[in-house]
Amino acid sequence: MKRKIFFGLILTSSIILSGSSLTKQIIDDNKKPDVNSGVTNSNENNNNGNTFVPEDSDSIEDSNVNVTPPVDNKKTIFIYLNPSVQTKNFYYGNLGTEAQHMQDIAHIMYEELKDIPFIHVDCNTYFKTLSLKEAVAESNSKHRHIHFALHSNAGGGSGTEVYTKDSIEFATKMYNTFLTLGNFNKRGVKVQNTLYETNNSKAEHTALMEFLFHDRKDEALYLVNNKKTIANTMVKGLIEFINENYW
């Protein structure tokens, strides 16, 4: 992957460094829909008229996320990515499992984040496969600024939702970021203290994303065919959140 980190430079056409602000270059999002998020404790909006963007056309390597923190504030941000380990949750039409596809997305995110200066990222993926409790314990073993859990949903519904105990700003950021990819059913940001992961994570900001419903044909196909796009978009959301809250 070609990645260039620039300190104190002005790059024509792609990157603008203003004062001590964060420099970042992120993939362009064409034809972004307007997104209005809500914070709720129950499901909302049953519109099933989903419209999805095309399958991945460019690799993650061709869509760089370049970041240069300000020189005078080199705060290292610690992130933990925890994809689903649910190997028995099968996608529509035997297209794989929730664990398989969420780990794929998390691994791409990990590869994108690990080379960014002043970001330290851990990921419970292929080479670990920790249980849920083990992953939360590993996340809690050091101070984390961000804990992000990746899941797909089931049960006959449709659309996107995210759960959090008290990190509403972070959860809303990741929710809105994913919704830029298509006209998905907006199920909302759910404040809840009964999920083990969101309730027991000690990170400053914790959210559990349910991207789409994997038992629905169109949504399962979208997740399977657009993992690089999803990963890159979620990295974009993370970087923007870090920029807004830490750098």
Residue ranges and their predicted role:
Residues 2-24:
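Sec-dependent N-terminal signal peptides of Gram-positive bacterial secreted proteins and lipoproteins
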Residues 118-126, 184-192, 245-247:
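Surface-exposed patches in mature extracellular/periplasmic domains of secreted proteins
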Residues 61-170:
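Catalytic-core regions of hydrolytic enzymes
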Residues 107-118, 140-144, 152, 175-183, ...:
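Sec-exported extracytoplasmic/periplasmic mature domains
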Residues 99, 103, 168, 172, ...:
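Non-membrane alpha-helical structural segments and their capping/turn regions in soluble enzymes
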Residues 166-190:
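Active-site-adjacent substrate-binding region
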Residues 80-82, 147-149, 190-247:
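Active-site-adjacent mobile loop/cap segments within catalytic or ligand-binding domains
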Residues 23-78:
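N-terminal, intrinsically disordered, polar/charged segments of Gram-positive cell-envelope systems
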